[in-house]
From Swiss-Prot:
Pathway: Glycan metabolism; beta-D-glucan degradation. The expression of beta-glucanase is influenced by auxins and cytokinins. This is Lichenase. It comes from Nicotiana plumbaginifolia (Leadwort-leaved tobacco). The active site is at 126 (proton donor), 271 (nucleophile). It is an enzyme of class 3 (hydrolase). One of its GO terms (molecular function) is licheninase activity. Residues 1-30 form the signal peptide. It catalyses: Hydrolysis of (1->4)-beta-D-glucosidic linkages in beta-D-glucans containing (1->3)- and (1->4)-bonds. The gene is GN1. Belongs to the glycosyl hydrolase 17 family. Its EC number is 3.2.1.73. It comes from the Eukaryota.
Amino acid sequence: MDTSHKHIALQMAAIILLGLLVSSTEIVGAQSVGVCYGMLGNNLPPASQVVQLYKSKNIRRMRLYDPNQAALQALRGSNIEVMLGVPNSDLQNIAANPSNANNWVQRNVRNFWPAVKFRYIAVGNEVSPVTGTSSLTRYLLPAMRNIRNAISSAGLQNNIKVSSSVDMTLIGNSFPPSQGSFRNDVRSFIDPIIGFVRRINSPLLVNIYPYFSYAGNPRDISLPYALFTAPNVVVQDGSLGYRNLFDAMSDAVYAALSRAGGGSIEIVVSESGWPSAGAFAATTNNAATYYKNLIQHVKRGSPRRPNKVIETYLFAMFDENNKNPELEKHFGLFSPNKQPKYPLSFGFSDRYWDISAENNATAASLISEM
């Protein structure tokens, strides 16, 4: 082979390699995104159909808020990784006695492992001293310890991480992100949890909603900043520039963790979403933009942690008509008839979900009401 042909061959090889790397990054990014499977609706499909929908749409991770037995049975052999919740209503019982935790783990984890791929046990959801769940705060850490000990007794501590899902009400200062810190009046609650999570090498699960921050302060927060569509840096924080609110919020949590002695802890975004109706700025277009951009964005990391994929769970799989207030009914990626509301992709970016059937159904419904 002469020199010119060798040069062309090397160029072609480099192009192919670059394409493979881009594809690999895209796949890894999509696979780091899961979807929360809530069940507070009276018109939702059965769990077996929901699991098939996850598989057909290439959604590889699921958050379950409680150990629904039909869902766990349907997940057998699915290869879907599961974040399984210990409901807030179970915290007092599990905190009271290690045997209660052992029974819970036996019934809901060991009976299904390894046919069901549990990734995390989320003990409690949004328990906080400054919200309506304040009465549960004293049970949370003992429940986490008992569940962790039960997981260890089952020999699964290297396979299944134990943590809790917290929300942004615990953050006192989030601007600029580098100055993120926990509220002084929650430190006695959160600091021991941070210490426990650090010792067992688990992530902290955090529910992050740019929607609520934007809707609560649209004067100072722009819609493009909340939707990942700002063309330029909006917040300059020292050497770090922020073009979207999601990054600013997640990096504020990292800064708060660092200040509380948890600098080595990873965060997993256990919920993030945007409603399509029911409140200010809750539109189908805004929700579609948010979800699409979030899926693409998390593979890039944040300014504080560039090129480090942010494991994220979209809220939620379906619109749930038994939730309140009104906007809580409209976070679904899918309508209860299993039709996607938005053209999203959990694989290659050119393979978007077909929403024509949903649009046709909506049009037919409107015509019938005329």
